[in-house]
């Protein structure tokens, strides 16, 4: 009886177990996971070609980049120096400057000597008096505190600080300057900024100075027969280097009154020097300078050796800027160049005269009747051309 009952039960248990293990009759093959689809490899990407290296700067581009670098350095140094100069102007110094402007002097030389002794002068400027002899030089040119004076390219104001206070009451000082608001990468704009900063340091001394903006690309002076004295100090070589000497001297002649004076101080080259070459080093031959200026409506009225220096050999690789105050070589042989001092300079006085009128063209002669043709002669040997 028990065996008969256990048989069906055992069969049912086996069936249930089989059903559980096979998911109730589904075949193992039907429930097996499908294999993953093959993954396509990513398409090959060709990297873009490397950019071509920038072209090598040309020699001119390198030169310009170096010039801009030097300009930035010079500007930074000038601005730093100006900050020190502004800070130097204490109330006591301003008071002394005002007193100098108000002081009365018996003559021009005494006025300049009074300005030379002032503490208002920029530090270091008085150290150059022994080389530049301003009282003797200006007296030679006929300077008086009642004149209208034009200082042509005053640089950093070495003469300006002597002229401005002594002309403020009864005279007038005009000073040329380049546009300080010109392009930042233009060195002429920088020079204009330097002089403007100089004037702005002391309204007491320089408040009455009238600046005359000039453009070397279009040389022009607005003054016409109104100036007594033009001071052209250490600037002629720059005019020559830029090919502008004749036109600027002509403009100066036009600005002067009849019999007005042009005072020239210029680094003096050796007599046999070629002007176009020596000008690159800052020097010009004296005889040539006189001839060129007289050709523009001037007459030489006198020479002075106040600024002569026989120690100047004029043969430095760095030109006249090798000497003080520039010391282009830095500390190299500095003592040697300091012992020489500033350059040997011509000091000339010219007076304005009427320009020679150009010769009128000769009236053409009445053409003669053509002569009978002559027998051609043997051609002559051509003459040897003259040297330029």
Spans of features found by a protein language model:
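Bacterial signal peptide processing site
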Residues: 25-28
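Class I SAM-dependent methyltransferase Rossmann-like catalytic core
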Residues: 110-144
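Conserved class I S-adenosyl-L-methionine
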Residues: 144-155
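A short glycine-rich, Lys/Arg-flanked "PGG" loop and its adjoining helix->strand segment in the class I
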Residues: 164-165, 245-260
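Conserved beta-strand signature within the Rossmann-like core of class I S-adenosyl-L-methionine
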Residues: 174-176, 259-267
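S-adenosyl-L-methionine
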Residues: 186-219
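A short acidic, Gly/Pro-enriched loop at the edge of an enzyme's catalytic core
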Residues: 209, 219-230
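A short, conserved alpha-helix within the catalytic core of class I
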Residues: 216, 238-251
């Amino acid at each position: 009886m028990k065996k008969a009952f256990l048989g069906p039960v055992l069969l049912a248990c086996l069936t249930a177990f089989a059903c559980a293990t096979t998911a109730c009759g589904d075949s193992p093959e039907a429930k097996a996971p499908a294999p993953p689809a093959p993954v396509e490899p990513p398409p090959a990407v060709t990297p873009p070609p490397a950019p071509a290296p920038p072209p090598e700067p040309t020699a001119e581009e390198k030169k310009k980049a170096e010039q801009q670098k030097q300009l930035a350095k010079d500007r930074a140094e000038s601005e730093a120096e100006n900050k020190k100069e502004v800070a130097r102007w204490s109330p006591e110094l301003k008071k002394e400057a005002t007193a100098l402007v108000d002081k009365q002097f018996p003559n021009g030389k005494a006025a300049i000597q009074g300005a030379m002794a002032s503490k208002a002068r920029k530090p270091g400027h008085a150290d150059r008096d022994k080389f530049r002899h301003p009282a003797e030089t200006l007296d030679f040119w006929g300077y008086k505190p009642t004149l209208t004076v034009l200082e042509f390219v005053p640089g950093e104001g070495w003469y300006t600080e002597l002229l401005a206070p002594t002309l403020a009451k009864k005279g007038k000082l005009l000073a040329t300057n380049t546009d300080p608001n010109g392009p930042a990468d233009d060195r002429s704009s920088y020079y204009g900024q330097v002089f403007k900063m100089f004037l702005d340091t002391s309204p007491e001394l320089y408040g009455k100075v009238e600046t005359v903006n000039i453009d070397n690309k279009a040389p022009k002076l607005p003054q016409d027969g109104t100036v007594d004295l033009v001071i052209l100090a250490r600037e002629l070589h720059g005019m020559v280097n830029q090919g502008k000497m004749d036109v600027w001297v002509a403009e100066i002649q036009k600005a002067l009154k009849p019999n007005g004076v042009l005072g020239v101080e210029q680094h003096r080259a050796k007599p046999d020097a070629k002007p176009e070459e020596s000008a690159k080093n800052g020097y010009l031959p004296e005889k040539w300078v006189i001839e060129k200026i007289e050709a523009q409506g001037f007459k030489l009225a006198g020479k002075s050796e106040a600024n002569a220096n026989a120690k100047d050999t004029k043969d430095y690789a760095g030109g006249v800027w090798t000497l003080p105050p520039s010391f282009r070589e830095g500390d190299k042989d500095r003592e040697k160049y300091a012992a020489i001092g500033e350059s040997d300079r011509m000091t000339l006085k010219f007076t304005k005269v009427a320009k020679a009128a150009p010769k009128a063209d000769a009236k053409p002669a009445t053409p003669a009747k053509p002569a009978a043709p002559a027998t051609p002669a043997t051609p002559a040997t051509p003459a040897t051309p003259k040297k330029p």
